[in-house]
Design a protein with these regions (language model features):
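Hydrophobic ligand-binding cavity/cleft-lining segments
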Residues: 1-50, 146
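Hydrophobic pocket/interface hotspot
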Residues: 26-30, 36, 55-57, 72, ...
Length: 148
């Protein structure tokens, strides 16, 4: 959804997958930043654990890419982790939620990104970016589900 009153145009993208593992197993892999490259394409991540910890990611192929700095703004094991993107390229929030389903889980990943664009351009960019981003998140979550 695009907010026409804001100078930065927000973009919300969500994907979800069923995982045949209990919430603690999902949480452990989800917050093992050093393993994110196993399920998120073209990404290397390192960082701490817990509220206020810093997480740093590199998204790209070879030398072409960008650094994504984040601060953990919510930490509620094994259910919810929110990171605040603070870099120059990516700003907004990444929300990772684990929903218990019996002895298994649903893993929902939402990105609320602040596009540095005027509202009209943000709306147009959202039409282009959203389906690509949704497919990327969904593909990553399918890989994640196979790892646990």
């Amino acid at each position: 959804m695009t907010d026409v009153s804001s100078p930065a145009s927000p973009l919300r993208v969500t994907a979800q997958v069923h995982v045949r593992a209990d919430p603690h197993q999902v949480w452990d892999l989800m917050t093992d930043w050093s393993r994110q490259h196993e399920w998120i394409w073209a990404t290397q991540v390192r960082g701490g654990q817990g509220l206020g910890a810093t997480v740093v990611g590199w998204t790209g192929v070879g030398p072409v890419g960008f650094t994504d700095t984040m601060i953990i703004s919510e930490w509620d094991p094994p259910l919810r982790c929110v990171v605040r993107h603070t870099g120059r390229v990516v700003r907004g929030s990444g929300i990772f939620e684990v929903i218990p389903v019996g002895t298994e889980s649903e893993f929902r990943w939402t990105e609320e990104l602040e596009l540095p664009l005027p509202p009209a351009m943000g709306k147009l960019a959202g039409l282009v970016i959203r389906p690509i981003a949704e497919q990327g998140l969904a593909a990553s979550l399918r890989r994640f589900a196979r790892l646990v």
